[in-house]
Amino acid sequence: MSDLSTLRQSYLDRISAAADGDALEQVRLAALGKKGEISGMMKELGRMTPEERQTTGAALNRLKDEIDAALRARKQGLEDAALDARLKEEWLDVTLPGRPRPQGTIHPISQVTEEVTAIFADMGFRVAEGPQIESDWFNFDALNIPPEHPARQEHDTFFMARAGDDPRPPQVLRTHTSPVQIRAMQATGAPIRVICPGRVYRMDMDQTHTPMFHQVEGLALGKDISMANLKWTLEEFCRAFFEVDEVELRFRASHFPFTEPSAEVDIRCSWEGGKLTIGQGESWLEILGSGMVHPKVLAAGGIDPEQWQGFAFGMGIDRIAMLKYGIPDLRAFFESDLRWLRHYGFAAGDVPSVAGGLSR
């Protein structure tokens, strides 16, 4: 046992004297490596009598544990000392301002889509989506738009190219998101409350029109839904979206193939000083179209028009974004101008909600 005591002290001294990690590793290998001195002594236990093995084995295990603990402690001490030395050599000015990292912004179209979704979700509407390439049946026939209707002409609608002998029905880039309403009715039946936001396509290009733009349409079906429900829904939407206490809407008789009766909706506003103010003034501004769903459209969606009725409405997301945020030219939405995006964009944390506020 006295030999083990001497061996213990020898290794503890060598561990204390190790000046770096390499020297410490040499001590570890000499003591506890596969060919180390203590490891070799452990291998000799098999040749001893049971009594000797019990006594010597316990002593060797204690020695091994003590050496291992000393090695770990010394290693940590060397690492701490190296860190202290490096910190003393390096100089860091904690008052120096950080380098700004480039930040992206949320596009106004994405932001307004989220705002609209949040408002209608609060009224119990869910979001429905559908394909942007539609058959002419979903885009026209199911919506009571006959073959002779002007909207079906090639100068208004993007028809997909196809071979002359292709037996499939004509395909178009959808001109509105109304086909999604047909698909939603076919999928779930009535009652139903959905909004259908998405891209739509028409052959038009000027300051307030682009070949691709964004639209949101809404559909609500029930047993006793009337124009009064439509009026309340649109008033609540406009009040929440434009963030004003009072709004006044004007319903003008119009014609849409998929609704009967149909109405275009104007909102009272003021242009005093060249600035648009919603909810006051003597002017009126058209913002959306609406009406009671035509019985033929209900039938195309698999709904019995004798038992169910409802309303539908639609508006351009790009247009209401321009009105709310004072954006003068629709084409700028799609030009990918970083300066424009920084000016009109929204921070990633500006998540709209009815309770917390829609806009910054």
Curated annotation (Swiss-Prot):
- InterPro entries, alphabetized: aa-tRNA-synth_II, aa-tRNA-synth_II/BPL/LPL, Phe-tRNA-synth_IIc_asu, Phe-tRNA_ligase_II_N, Phe_tRNA_ligase_alpha1_bac, Phenylalanyl-tRNA_Synthase, tRNA-bd_arm
Question: What molecular function does GO assign, one term?
Answer: phenylalanine-tRNA ligase activity
Where in or outside the cell it occurs: the entry states: Cytoplasm
Q: Which CDD domains match?
A: PheRS_alpha_core
> What is the E.C. number?
6.1.1.20
Report residues binding Mg(2+).
E260
Please indicate if the UniProt record lists Nucleotidyltransferase as a keyword.
no
**PROSITE patterns per the UniProt record, alphabetical:** AA_TRNA_LIGASE_II
Q: Which Gene3D superfamilies match?
A: Bira Bifunctional Protein, Domain 2
GO BP annotations listed? phenylalanyl-tRNA aminoacylation
Q: Which GO terms describe its cellular component?
A: cytoplasm
Which controlled-vocabulary keywords does the entry list? Aminoacyl-tRNA synthetase, ATP-binding, Cytoplasm, Ligase, Magnesium, Metal-binding, Nucleotide-binding, Protein biosynthesis
Which note does the record give on the cofactor?
Answer: Binds 2 magnesium ions per tetramer.
Top-level taxon: Bacteria
What assembly does the database describe for this protein? Tetramer of two alpha and two beta subunits.
Q: What's this protein's name? A: Phenylalanine--tRNA ligase alpha subunit
Species source reads Paracoccus denitrificans (strain Pd 1222)
What is the primary gene name for this protein?
A: pheS
